[in-house]
């Protein structure tokens, strides 16, 4: 780097030029630039010394890089195209995903309580709510960052783009929260669907019991005469007791199955309610930011409209001024021409008068 030392004293002047890897150094009101940092040293026997640390400059530059060069180190707009911002692009994509999830969830909720209702349908509802909630939670930090960038931007267009995107994201949250609440309410009020693969064994078991009873009765009725009535009665009671135990076992299995279904439903409803609470917290947080920026949006839009109107009025005034200027120019030309003609006539008259 360039090193220039200027020393003033005793009426003399001394200039030394050289190269210094530390940067450009000018003592007595000079400038020192070290590795991208800015250091201004003014020391002139009673002057002042202003040192700005290099670390502060590096931190500010790192902040700029983290925000995709959309804003300079003072936090104001440095990139005209806000769509190049990574958070802006990510939020735009995820808004579309949330809207798709709302449509899918709406169709699934409409199936609850209908013949097409099934445990698989309810499982899809829970998975959709859970995955979308995670998406919203991970995206909320980026949306807050966009709100912060919008408040720092000096460009009115950039500010509007950021704030409208945040508002659109908040609207998607409201729609998703509403349909999730509807899903919870319908799951609580509609009866549980019975799985077809569970109905079949029960019916089959009952048919088997009926067939067994018929076979047993037929067997008892066709016994040989040498069996006495007591033995026949004991065997009949034994068969009836066996059939009763099978029925009790089937009833107990049915009860356990229903309990497991109820527990699964309650667990799914609880998860959906937790997701609603989480989404509501994010919604309230972002709503406050949107409300704070809403006045600014209206002010900016009003300012843009006022600027447009003023610009049109200014153009009209310029046109009128241009017309007036041309008219004045024409009038001046005519006046000058008339004066020249008058002067020429007077000159001719004066010429002939003097000749006489």
Curated annotation (Swiss-Prot):
SMART domains: t_SNARE
Region (Disordered): 32-88, 187-247
TM annotation in the entry: 334-354
Ranges for domain t-SNARE coiled-coil homology: 259-321
Biased composition (Low complexity): 32-74, 207-224
InterPro entries found in the cross-reference section: SNARE (IPR010989), Syntaxin (IPR045242), Syntaxin/epimorphin_CS (IPR006012), Syntaxin_N (IPR006011), T_SNARE_dom (IPR000727)
Bilayer topology annotation: Single-pass membrane protein
Subcellular localization(s) per the UniProt record: Endosome membrane
Vesicular side: 355-356
Keywords assigned: Coiled coil, Endosome, Membrane, Phosphoprotein, Signal-anchor, Transmembrane, Transmembrane helix, Transport
Subunit structure: Component of the SNARE complex composed of syn7A, syn8A, vamp7A and vti1A. Interacts with nsfA, snpA and snpC.
Family to which the UniProt record says this protein belongs: Belongs to the syntaxin family.
Name assigned to this protein: Syntaxin-7A
Organism: Dictyostelium discoideum (Social amoeba)
Designated gene of the protein: syn7A
